[in-house]
Amino acid sequence: KITPDSTLTPSGSENGMLAQRLEGQDFQDLAFGTSDAKTITVSWYAKTSATGAGNYTVKVEYHNGSANYAVNKLFAFTTTWTRYTYTIPATGTATSVGIVDSNALGFRVEYHLFAGPDDVHSQFTQWTSNSTPTYKVISGQKNFMDNTNNELYITGLQIEVGDTATSFEHISHGEQLRRCQRYCVVYGGTGTRHLGCASAYNSTNINLSMHLPVPMRAVPSPTTILTSGNWLQVYMGASGNISNAGISLTDIDADHNTLRAYITSAHSGLTAGQALWCHVLANAKLIVSAEI
């Protein structure tokens, strides 16, 4: 669900969208860049509030590592839950330009919410080189930002080989969680959360080995959400210290499954090698993200 918190009349190249970004290595079975390139069907469910109903540009895009190629189409979103399907033949650049084969951005589905006049263009009816400006909409696009009562709900996005949308594939909560944790792991909640045991690097900084629940897509970046200006509590014996410590992450193994967290200004008066234990404060968070 998304809703505007203020109104906006877009000008120039202002634009906004919801986008699902996907790894290129997961789309090699499409055989793009060859004469065997495959047709795909994208499907999803959507509905709007009464004021949010209108035509929305849906753009599907692939990347070859240096440029992107796209198709797009207008869809009328209404106040009733509806399943939409978008079948895209393997024409245009699909037979001549492949999808990057790595964990980098290779495929993206975009639901455009608004765009200024500079980003309004004619429809791409087949896979086409998508030159600047990248975020194009089709004439007739709804301005989702014209009313703070606008609401848009989207769920059940599915991408399949072929010209038919099959029933949405439901997977177990455990498997879905593992897939999500490839991109983001959150430590913290309403109560304190144990983060791990660490050793003092010097009098104020510490090294913490972090064992992630699954291998991540890439070396992640840390973000902290504070409570009363702090996020971390570090104990050396019974001596605890609460702080807004700095944190950086580096790989210990090539699978991005174990990390070294170097945490600065975590305590004081430490001796190198001293053992410590760390937890995230209640209502604070450490977010470890490897999003594309």
Question: Residue locations for each model-derived region?
Answer:
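Extracellular and organelle-lumenal recognition/adhesion modules and their flexible linkers in secreted
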Residues: 1-292
